[in-house]
From Swiss-Prot:
GO terms for biological process: patulin biosynthetic process. This is Alcohol dehydrogenase patD. Disruption phenotype: Strongly reduces the production of patulin. It catalyses: neopatulin + NADPH + H(+) = (E)-ascladiol + NADP(+). Pathway: Mycotoxin biosynthesis; patulin biosynthesis. Substrate binds at residue 67. Induction: Expression is correlated with the production of patulin. Expression is positively regulated by the secondary metabolism regulator laeA. Expression is strongly decreased with increased sucrose concentrations. This decrease is lost in the presence of malic acid. Expression is increased with pH changes from 2.5 to 3.5 in the presence of a limiting concentration of sucrose, 50 mM. Natural phenols present in apple fruits such as chlorogenic acid or the flavonoid epicatechin modulate patulin biosynthesis. InterPro entries: ADH-like_C, ADH-like_N, GroES-like_sf, NAD(P)-bd_dom_sf, PKS_ER. Alcohol dehydrogenase; part of the gene cluster that mediates the biosynthesis of patulin, an acetate-derived tetraketide mycotoxin produced by several fungal species that shows antimicrobial properties against several bacteria. PatD catalyzes the conversion of neopatulin into E-ascladiol. The pathway begins with the synthesis of 6-methylsalicylic acid by the polyketide synthase (PKS) patK via condensation of acetate and malonate units. The 6-methylsalicylic acid decarboxylase patG then catalyzes the decarboxylation of 6-methylsalicylic acid to yield m-cresol (also known as 3-methylphenol). Its cofactor is Zn(2+). Zn(2+) 2 binds at residues 101, 104, 112.
């Protein structure tokens, strides 16, 4: 262990199902082979962290949440040759893979049959230090702001990676539904991908903001029929659904043009879809599960090159419960980030 590394550190932990976070001091342990000890600079607070609190994915307790981690390498496991002390490093939702399953053999490491998830199946980044696996470690540029870029490791890579895999050519009409943590980034990425971007939201006061982020058109769905408005524009080649509003799924399908794709990035639960809305015009419904380490590096490099701005509110570690509550209430604009 490096001489500057302390023997103890603080972490925020869920001790039992449904409870709030407990801030505690614990002993620092060395990383094992294929592990990296990270001195955390910032960790985003994502709605998926609620899965840790409720044990929805079976991570158990106690558990430190957080999967939008940026920091510096404090120590490396035995035999490590790529990472060294002081390197800028990140940890995302994807926390590790076996490299042998069918998904891994196809390069979809974030879909691994035995995937580990930071902050869900292993302790995450609501802490001064955390340990991440080397195969899931993300190279982070030295010059980027840790708090601003931490959410890129979930919200950013999710919208970036999903949209690029839809293979929509530049110049096509792309609509973004929702202007929250995912949506405000999706608007910016879509604009920089070269699309004609339409923002869909239920609030007329957000139009100016949406246009500043890169929207060429704005549809207030509380005042205007989104189907008619999108069809008047020619029908969307892609609609990205970022807000969990199940009742809007069928109307969004009707807003697609011929061979249009509806990309669902928010978990809305069970929905009914009229298949007749799909078959006649070759429309389809898609989803995409975040990304692996290289995808995260691509999302960050693209954001850095094009000036994509993640809007955040910062909270110190001892205000972790306030940060979590603001995220759950939807009062934060637009991503809460815990800074050390």
């Amino acid at each position: 262990m490096a001489s500057t590394t302390p023997s103890t550190y603080k972490q925020a932990v869920f001790k039992e199902q449904g409870a709030g976070l407990t801030l505690e001091e614990v002993a620092l342990t060395l990383p094992k082979r294929d592990e990296i000890l990270v001195k955390v600079e910032a960790c985003g607070v994502c709605h998926s962290d609620h899965f840790a609190q409720t044990n929805l994915m079976g991570g158990g307790f106690p558990l430190v949440p957080g999967h939008e981690i940026i920091g510096r390498v404090a120590a490396v496991g035995e035999g490590e040759t790529v990472w060294k002390e002081g390197d800028r490093i990140g940890g995302a939702w994807h926390g590790g893979h076996d490299g042998t399953c069918g998904a891994c053999k196809k390069g979809f490491f974030q879909m691994c049959d035995n995937e580990q998830v930071n902050g869900i199946s292993r302790n995450g980044g609501y802490a001064e230090y955390c340990i991440i696996r080397r195969e899931a470690a993300v190279h982070i540029p030295d010059h980027v702001n840790a708090a601003k870029y931490a959410p890129m490791l979930c919200a950013g890579v999710t919208v970036f990676n999903a949209m690029r895999h839809m293979k929509i050519p530049p110049g096509e009409l792309v609509a973004i539904q929702g202007l929250g943590g995912l949506g405000h980034l999706a608007l910016q990425y879509a604009n920089k991908f070269g699309y004609r971007v339409v923002a869909l939201s239920r609030d007329s006061t957000k139009e100016e903001f949406a246009r500043k982020l890169g929207a060429h058109e704005y549809i207030d769905t509380s005042r205007e029929d989104p189907v008619a408005a999108l069809q008047k524009l020619g029908g969307a080649s892609l609609i990205v659904s970022t807000a969990p509003v199940p009742e809007i799924i069928n109307p969004l399908i009707q807003g697609l043009g011929v061979m249009g794709k509806l990309l669902i990035l928010s978990i809305v639960g069970g929905i009914e879809v009229h298949t007749g809305l799909l078959v006649g015009k070759g429309k389809s419904i898609w989803s995409w599960p975040s990304g692996h380490a290289t995808d995260s590096e691509d999302a960050i490099a693209f954001a850095d090159l094009h000036g994509i701005d993640c809007l955040i509110e910062e909270f110190p570690l001892d205000k972790c419960n306030e940060a979590f509550a603001a995220m759950m209430e939807g009062s934060v604009r637009f991503r809460a980030v815990i800074t050390m």
